[in-house]
Amino acid sequence: MTEATGNEKNMEDEKLKILAAFDLETSGLDPAVHDIIEIAIVPLNPDFKRSDLPEFTARIKAVHPENADPESLKISGLNPFEGEDIQKVATDITKWMSDNHIERIEAVGHNLRFDLDFFQIKFPSLFRIFSSHCHDSMQLAIIINDISLLQTGKKLFPSVSLRNLKLQLGMEDPVQHRSMNDALDAAKLYRRLQTKLIIN
């Protein structure tokens, strides 16, 4: 077994663990039946604002377009027959991470369990790129509601949907239901929710 050279060791040390806004658009709600048809991974700085690292986005051709839910397609406006093959997208994600020296991603998003479960099933060989630590604006809103209920007797947010939280926090642009826009919305929403938590 050979030891790594100094240069190789430096490259290993330089591999990044990053925050990234993450969102998928899918052809339905069931990962066992439906497909990912769009993905966005947008690197963020520690303050949850967009970083200088390039984002990864892709349209993905559905493996089973015949299973697509018409209502889901109507919401996103995406055609499940368009995009790259999912195997190519998997290769492209790996290359994007390698080119940018990214080792692990802490996902930032809204209702991340949905997106991460879909990703794990559709990209099983890549699921370990995501850290077990994540930053979910929906979960943060639920925590804030719990604190508010304890302190004031009522919830601060009547609904923790992305649409309703955006409206309540002054983000007036409508939810786009496209992965890039929704990923960035979730990161912005997370920052705004943080202002509701005061740590003395």
Locations of the language-model features?
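Acidic, Mg2+-coordinating catalytic module of metal-dependent nucleases/exonucleases
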Residues: 106-112, 117-122, 153-200
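Secondary-structure boundary motif
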Residues: 95-102, 125, 195, 199
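Short, glycine/acidic-enriched loop or turn micro-motifs at the edges of active sites
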Residues: 24-28, 139, 185
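Short alpha-helix plus adjacent loop in nuclease-associated cores
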Residues: 135-154
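Conserved non-catalytic scaffold segment of RNase H-like nuclease domains
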Residues: 2-120, 167-172, 177
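A short alpha->loop->secondary-structure connector
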Residues: 124-134
